[in-house]
């Protein structure tokens, strides 16, 4: 992952607007590819095909149990994978669920691009 321009990041987001925000924030570092609707098998297959080391998983109150299970399952299958949760930064329960599931960090939707890019740079150095 020394060539940051060739990085591919996977994302499971609430909607296309969130995906576009993430793509814009990470455009200087690589490309963000949608990982579909949240199927573990689909996510793991995409990780294998794209060699992505970092996955963004959107969390919301309605689906937090399934989304947390997805994070846990992905990390169980791919322990070296880094997962960053996305969600409402004001919702402490989402943040707690993300951390308990094994996410490395939590990013609030709409955060400044520089914050997101800085986080990804730091995480990429550890991968």
Language model segments and positions:
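C-terminal output helix
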Residues: 111-119
